């Protein structure tokens, strides 16, 4: 294991608490270990040794990709993390060079972009992070405990700790801290607890998506010689409501995710699940998995709505409290930005702590509010294309939808435009990069080439001798 993160020479504070052992919570705890003499991570689930699914992560059996900015944060907090994750079995996939990606009616050009999708199971990623975190001498993990409320100063202007207990009852105890980080996910009770303390109820934006995910593990088929590592087949919005992702994970396994919107649920029986891949707009995933060996059950996850809590808009908010990850903002997972956004929030918290604890809550909320704008806009703009989705469309939404369709066609054949699009998707550049004068000109004037229309991946399996003879 690589050398642990150096301890702070001049700590910002004595004790910080993170509650919620999500990836955002684990990263936040690692970040705080550099700023506080002592950090306590509280997690409701019992944390077992090894990479195992947790009850508190219902989406844990599905495709979880970490994007390049998220990996960069992890490597900053835990030096050598990239190498450790690779050694554990993660696949590092160039997002355009090694990713066969069909979207908007076109196969995207296959050119290296230097930005990666880090593919592994969610339990493996959590396990590797947790090992590094637990190696830090100033981090203590309290698993099998749930937080039931906040401790506050007499004037309720500052959160000073938490109440916690064993789930289901038992003796309650208190932990005091100078900073409490809520990483408890989209079901966070912070809005209710703040309201009970006399603070205004946080404004929330919900955008319904009603998407169902069904995922299953398969053994990598023998003889697979595909010229790609990962494949995504996405819908052409808003007329298509089905998509699929096939990604490699550890132990020579492949994870297939099928998704359907607004009542189009993937079949959950063995034959129906595999058979439904024939209905995808492209045949390649079906060709790979039709005879592949399944390695477990079909896991289902229903996601009802995007959810954003606008803590940055609150006129009054206690010091000593910072929500991160899904507790702040939860995106439709199909866009793959959730874990990376959580990591960037933890990084923002670290940057704000460099200025001390005074005024931290305001600085942090403002910075995260700005950070979320780009990924939130990208995720919700796609979801709002479906007429079934309830939610306020921004002004000129019809014009933006038209522009988006033209942009999708452009990145299907223009390598420079594709590179910009991916940099925005990976949160390296803001969404405004898609509206630069040069990009707008291309969107308005460019037309797909014949080569782009004919582009497709190579067959995933080498032809048999019989097939070669027949072709001859």
Segments and roles (model prediction):
Residues 350-472:
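C-terminal helical "tail/cap" subdomain of flavin- and related membrane-associated enzymes
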């Amino acid at each position: 294991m690589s050398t642990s993160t150096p301890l702070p020479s001049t700590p910002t504070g004595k004790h910080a608490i993170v509650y919620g052992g999500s990836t955002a919570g684990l990263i936040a705890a690692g970040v705080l270990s550099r700023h506080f003499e002592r950090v306590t991570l509280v997690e409701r689930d019992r944390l077992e040794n090894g990479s195992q699914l947790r009850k508190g992560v219902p989406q844990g059996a599905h495709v979880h990709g970490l994007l390049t900015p998220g990996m960069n944060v992890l490597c900053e907090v835990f030096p050598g993390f990239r190498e450790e994750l690779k050694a554990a079995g993660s696949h590092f996939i160039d997002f355009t060079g090694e990713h066969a990606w069909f979207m908007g009616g076109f196969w995207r050009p296959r050119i290296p972009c230097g930005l990666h999708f880090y593919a592994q199971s969610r339990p493996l990623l959590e396990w590797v992070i947790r090992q590094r975190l637990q190696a830090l001498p100033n981090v203590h993990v309290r698993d099998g405990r749930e937080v039931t409320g906040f401790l506050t100063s007499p004037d309720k202007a500052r959160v000073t700790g938490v109440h916690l207990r064993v789930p289901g009852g038992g003796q309650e105890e208190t932990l005091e801290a100078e900073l409490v980080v809520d990483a408890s996910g989209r079901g966070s009770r912070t809005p209710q607890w703040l309201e009970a303390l006399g603070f205004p109820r946080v404004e929330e934006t919900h955008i319904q998506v009603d998407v169902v995910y069904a995922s299953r593990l398969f053994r990598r088929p023998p003889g697979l010689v595909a010229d790609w590592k990962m494949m995504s087949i996405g819908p052409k919005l808003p007329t298509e409501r089905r998509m699929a992702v096939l990604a490699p994970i550890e132990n020579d396994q492949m994870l297939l995710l099928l998704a359907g919107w607004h009542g189009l649920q993937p079949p959950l029986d063995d034959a129906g699940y595999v058979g439904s891949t024939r209905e995808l707009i492209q045949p390649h995933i079906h060709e790979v998995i039709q005879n592949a060996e399944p390695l477990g059950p079909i896991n289902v996850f229903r996601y009802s709505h995007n959810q954003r809590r606008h803590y940055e808009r609150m006129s009054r908010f206690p010091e000593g409290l910072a929500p991160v990850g899904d507790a702040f903002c939860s995106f439709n997972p199909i866009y793959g930005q959730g874990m990376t956004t959580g990591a960037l929030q933890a990084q923002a918290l670290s940057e704000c702590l460099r200025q001390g604890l005074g005024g931290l809550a305001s600085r942090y909320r403002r910075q995260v509010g700005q950070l979320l704008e780009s990924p939130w806009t990208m995720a919700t703009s796609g979801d709002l294309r479906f007429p079934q989705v309830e939610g306020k469309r921004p002004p000129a939404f019809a014009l933006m939808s038209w522009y988006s369709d033209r942009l999708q066609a452009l990145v299907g054949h223009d390598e420079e435009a594709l590179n910009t699009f991916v940099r925005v998707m990976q949160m390296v550049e803001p969404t405004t990069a898609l509206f630069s004068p040069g990009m707008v000109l291309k969107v308005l004037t460019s037309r797909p080439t014949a080569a782009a229309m004919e582009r497709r991946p190579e067959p995933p399996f080498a032809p048999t001798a019989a097939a070669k003879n027949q072709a001859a």
